[in-house]
Swiss-Prot record:
Gene3D superfamilies membership: N-(1-d-carboxylethyl)-l-norvaline Dehydrogenase, domain 2 (1.10.1040.10), NAD(P)-binding Rossmann-like Domain (3.40.50.720)
Binding site for Mg(2+) 1: 150, 154
Organism: Buchnera aphidicola subsp. Macrosiphoniella ludovicianae
GO molecular-function terms, A-Z: ketol-acid reductoisomerase activity; metal ion binding; NADP binding
GO cellular component, one term: cytosol
Organism taxonomic ancestry: Bacteria, Pseudomonadati, Pseudomonadota, Gammaproteobacteria, Enterobacterales
Pathway(s) where this gene product acts: Amino-acid biosynthesis; L-isoleucine biosynthesis; L-isoleucine from 2-oxobutanoate: step 2/4; Amino-acid biosynthesis; L-valine biosynthesis; L-valine from pyruvate: step 2/4
Protein residues bound to NADP(+): 1, 11, 41-43, 91
Catalysed reactions, as listed in the record: (2R)-2,3-dihydroxy-3-methylbutanoate + NADP(+) = (2S)-2-acetolactate + NADPH + H(+); (2R,3R)-2,3-dihydroxy-3-methylpentanoate + NADP(+) = (S)-2-ethyl-2-hydroxy-3-oxobutanoate + NADPH + H(+)
Name of the protein in its database record: Ketol-acid reductoisomerase (NADP(+))
Residues the entry annotates as binding Mg(2+) 2: 150, 322, 326
Protein encoded by which gene: ilvC
Family stated for the protein in its record: Belongs to the ketol-acid reductoisomerase family.
Cofactor(s) needed: Mg(2+)
Length: 343
């Protein structure tokens, strides 16, 4: 923004300190070969409309999520190439994984109606390489597949299940006379600790961290959870494929996020979010030994999300990214700020 440049605020200081070219929309975009739009989905239509007025012929417009194209039906000038590089995690985790010399699994795609010079895929590959995505795996997808699988993963195992399970497991621990601080810490850091095993050996390694008797119990619990949630997961998938889920979300945007803000308020005031600090150390194995239900929920949620996506026609690699592989990175956000960052 011009005002930020004139006042030389913190963003300006950070950018100039790291030798970035600083300028406003009108001065930078007309000369840019690649313009990346990383604004929130609900702002895309207005942002993209303004970008197109300034972008030069044969430039590239980049997305990290294709909601605006697929669900809003946004049309882009035919002389602009439209690509997507979608890391499968929150933006904060993309940066953290890059800083430690790695990256996150990434989907890339070219919008079929906007590949003006047939160079879209090469540009997308280069962009994914620059974020370190190639170190974790880059999969060519499509705008439609990325959006539908992303929404399904978020609404089920990645966000929906983790959030609900955090609240339910906390209440369960309290009813069994556990200290509120201990219960809060076990759940807040338990998801991160337990899902770390998924990175290295999938569900098999996660289950192997349990004793034989606990493993049997977790397996039986997971089967029961899958039976209970199967129809709900299928309904989520049907609503996402049909566009019903997105239309309701867009309507809430128009209502100034009334539903979203109400849900955030309710979550903020739950017992889990308000749980006190606990300064005693919980050993790594203790998270598994006292988190059998959490392990069962993870196993059931991952398998059910994956299976439901496959049944709807989403390819296995994409379903895997959106069910198992992204899960540890989402769990990290709970470890940082409980459910605040996720929401």
């Amino acid at each position: 923004r011009k005002n930020s440049i004139l006042k030389k605020n913190q963003s300006w200081i950070n950018a100039t300190k790291n030798n970035f070219l600083v300028g406003d929309y009108e001065s930078l975009i007309p000369n840019a070969d690649l313009v990346i739009n990383l604004t929130p989905d609900k702002q895309h239509s207005n942002v993209v409309k303004e970008l197109q007025k300034l972008m030069k012929k044969d430039a590239c417009l980049g997305y990290s999520h294709g909601f605006n194209i697929v669900e809003n039906g946004e049309t882009i000038r035919k002389d602009i190439t439209v690509i997507m590089v979608a890391p499968k995690c929150p933006g904060t985790e993309v940066r953290e994984e890059y800083k430690r010399g790695f990256g996150v699994p990434t989907l890339i795609a070219v919008h079929n109606e906007n590949d003006y010079s047939n160079m879209g895929l090469e540009v997308a590959k280069a962009w994914a390489f620059s974020t370190g995505g190639h170190r974790a795996g880059v999969l060519e997808s499509s705008f439609v597949a990325e959006v539908k699988s992303d929404l399904m993963g978020e609404q089920t195992i990645l966000c929906g299940m983790l959030q609900t399970a955090s609240l339910v497991c906390y209440e369960k621990l309290i009813t069994t006379q556990n200290h509120p601080g201990y219960a809060g810490k076990l759940i807040q850091f338990g998801w991160e600790t337990i899902t770390e095993s998924l990175k290295h050996g999938g569900i098999t390694l996660m289950m192997d961290r349990l004793s034989n008797s606990s493993k049997i119990r977790a397996f039986k619990l997971s089967q029961e959870i899958k039976r209970i949630f199967s129809k709900l997961f299928q309904k989520h998938m049907d609503d996402i494929i049909s566009g019903d889920f997105s239309s309701k979300m867009i309507q809430d945007w128009k209502n100034k996020d009334q539903n979203l803000l109400n849900w955030r308020y309710k979550t903020k005031n739950t017992s889990f979010e308000q749980s006190p600090d606990y300064d005693k150390k919980i050993l790594e194995q203790e998270y598994y030994d006292h988190g059998i239900l959490m392990v069962a929920i993870l196993k059931a949620g991952i398998e059910l999300s994956f299976e439901t996506m496959i049944q709807s026609g989403i390819m296995e690699e994409s379903a895997y990214y959106e069910s198992l592989h992204e899960l540890p990175l989402i769990a990290n956000t709970i470890a940082r700020k409980k459910l605040y960052e996720m929401n």
